[in-house]
């Protein structure tokens, strides 16, 4: 991987930055390569080229843009091993996690937006009958591209949650500059290579490598920002976007609760709890981060989950099927995970399995199950983002809902019960942007279903109509086809004209029911 290219000369403005960042393999600690930290002048030059390229990209229409996306879909499948290996090397995640999300989600999204973008962004006719003054006029809502979109991606899914956000923005007719995480930039550069090979015009999609200063410079140059990351960084992004007076959309932290009712399918719920808390090393924005279990099934549930988690294989992913849980991708995250576990133990929690950073090369935290937890502990209140599962005993589902809502976060939640009608009723009371019944995380694959956070978990949505319309400007059109030389309300004002208009208002609006 030492020969990885940091973009084309066009993407780096023909010169490497004086500053570089090393990209490591978290599974081994080995240096893969270095990437340049692009500065404000380079970002400004990239933005200028993107703005020049945008009108032509918009002009080729939905069909032309869709052809590029479908070619990219085929390219990813034809080069699946290379795509997966790129993700695995810079994240230390398992081949299976990389295939399921970074590859599987992205090829699905390329096809979905290629097919659905035109429908979501088609002109909408609006009825004019509700106001006599506008009666007979042609009213249209039009969705126009914002122009240049800046996407600031996270490190946990360097393709799915970085390039994945670029796809609808591109299909809407925008140009895009993607600033990937400095920890995992290589897969984004691979996506830039893919798009060039698939016929995307020059400068329509560019990758800006660098650190937080690069992201700040990007926000100052674009017309719209999409950010995925922590709530703390999201607030800084929102502040910078406000200074630039550009819209921003945020997918931020989560502390997703799982409520297991007394009548739940215990085997399925236990398997799901183990998987959806540990997949991708627990580094999933919609990971199960806290679990509330009815006291009548608590002991059996805890035993099943603990047995499952204790048997998970962790280590360097040397091939398919070699490990179940990979590395901790972001270096500071290892300390956060450890801090949350130590805080819980100090306050009375018990570790049933795991509980420690794993010694040796690479960054790992043992898959961990905690019990005897409560809401005084960080592991139940703050985003852990690691392979841990705190399980709390509850009296009933009502207590579970109350505790689920006792959080600053509201990204996702799940309810597990054999009574799906009761489960849906509980779901509607949980303060989260997405709630699943007898499932978790799978909603992310339903690309026609909006996904977004409440509370401090974000603003705006991915997927569905809102997932592409956020990258547009709404233009309203009113067209008068048969016009009078002079409307009755135009100058000059006369007493007779005023009386007639008053009578007209009374005739039209005065027949409503009186309280």
Q: Where would I find each of the regions flagged by the language model?
A:
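Short loop/turn microsegments at loop-to-beta-strand junctions
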Residues: 18-21, 288, 411
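N-terminal Rossmann-like NAD(P)+-binding subdomain of aldehyde/semialdehyde dehydrogenases
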Residues: 1-137
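ALDH superfamily catalytic-core signature
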Residues: 224, 232-374, 437, 498, ...
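Rossmann-like NAD(P) dinucleotide-binding subdomain of oxidoreductase/dehydrogenase enzymes
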Residues: 128-268, 322, 394
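Structural signal for hydrophobic packing residues in well-ordered secondary-structure cores
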Residues: 54, 58, 73-76, 80, ...
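Short, well-ordered beta-strand elements within core beta-sheets of diverse protein domains
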Residues: 31-38, 53-59, 151, 258-260, ...
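Conserved C-terminal structural/oligomerization subdomain of aldehyde/semialdehyde dehydrogenase
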Residues: 25-34, 357, 364-515
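Residue-level signal for inorganic ion chemistry
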Residues: 29, 65, 87, 110, ...
């Amino acid at each position: 991987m030492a020969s990885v290219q940091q973009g084309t000369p066009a993407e780096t403005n023909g010169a490497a930055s004086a500053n570089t960042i090393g990209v490591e393999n978290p599974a081994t600690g080995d240096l893969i390569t270095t990437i340049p930290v692009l500065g404000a002048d380079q970002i400004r030059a990239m933005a200028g080229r993107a703005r020049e390229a945008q009108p032509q990209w918009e002009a080729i229409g939905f069909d032309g843009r869709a052809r590029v996306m479908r070619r990219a879909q085929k390219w990813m499948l034809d080069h699946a091993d290379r795509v997966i290996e790129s993700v695995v090397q810079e994240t230390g995640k398992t081949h299976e996690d990389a295939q399921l999300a970074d590859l599987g989600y992205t090829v699905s999204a390329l096809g979905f937006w290629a097919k659905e973008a035109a429908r979501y962004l088609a002109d909408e006719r609006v009825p004019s009958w509700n106001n006599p003054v506008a009666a007979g006029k042609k009213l249209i809502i039009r969705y126009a591209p914002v122009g240049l979109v800046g996407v600031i991606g996270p490190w946990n899914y360097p393709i799915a949650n970085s390039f994945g956000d670029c796809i609808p923005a591109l299909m809407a007719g925008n140009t895009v500059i993607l600033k990937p995480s400095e920890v995992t930039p290589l897969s984004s550069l691979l996506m830039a290579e893919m798009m060039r090979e698939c016929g995307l015009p020059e400068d329509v999609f560019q990758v800006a490598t660098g650190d937080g200063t690069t992201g700040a410079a990007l926000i100052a140059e674009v017309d719209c920002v999409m950010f995925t990351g922590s709530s703390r960084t999201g607030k800084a992004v929102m502040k910078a976007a406000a200074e630039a007076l550009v819209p921003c959309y945020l997918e931020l932290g989560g502390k997703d609760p799982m409520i297991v009712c007394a009548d739940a399918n215990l085997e399925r719920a236990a398997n799901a709890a183990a998987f959806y808390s540990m997949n991708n090393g627990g580094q999933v924005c919609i990971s199960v981060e806290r679990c509330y279990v009815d006291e009548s099934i608590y002991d059996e549930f805890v035993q099943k989950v603990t047995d499952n988690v204790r048997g998970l294989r962790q280590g360097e992913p040397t091939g398919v099927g070699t490990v179940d849980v990979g590395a901790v991708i972001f270096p500071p995250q290892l300390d956060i995970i450890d801090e949350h576990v130590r805080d819980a133990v100090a306050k009375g929690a018990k570790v049933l399995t795991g509980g420690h950073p794993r010694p040796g090369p690479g960054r790992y935290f043992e898959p961990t199950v905690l019990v005897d937890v409560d809401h005084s502990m960080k592991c139940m209140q703050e985003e852990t983002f690691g392979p841990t599962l705190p399980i709390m005993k509850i009296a009933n589902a009502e207590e579970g809902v109350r505790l689920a809502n006792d959080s600053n976060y509201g990204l996702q939640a799940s309810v597990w019960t054999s009574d799906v009608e009761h489960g849906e009723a509980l779901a509607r009371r949980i303060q989260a942007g997405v709630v699943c019944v007898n499932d978790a995380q799978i909603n992310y694959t339903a690309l026609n279903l909006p996904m977004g956070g409440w509370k401090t978990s974000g603003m705006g949505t991915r997927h569905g109509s809102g997932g592409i319309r956020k990258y547009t400007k709404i233009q309203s059109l009113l067209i008068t086809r048969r016009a009078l030389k002079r409307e009755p309300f135009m100058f000059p004002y006369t007493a007779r004209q005023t009386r007639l208009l008053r009578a007209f208002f009374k005739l039209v609006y005065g027949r409503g029911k009186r309280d």
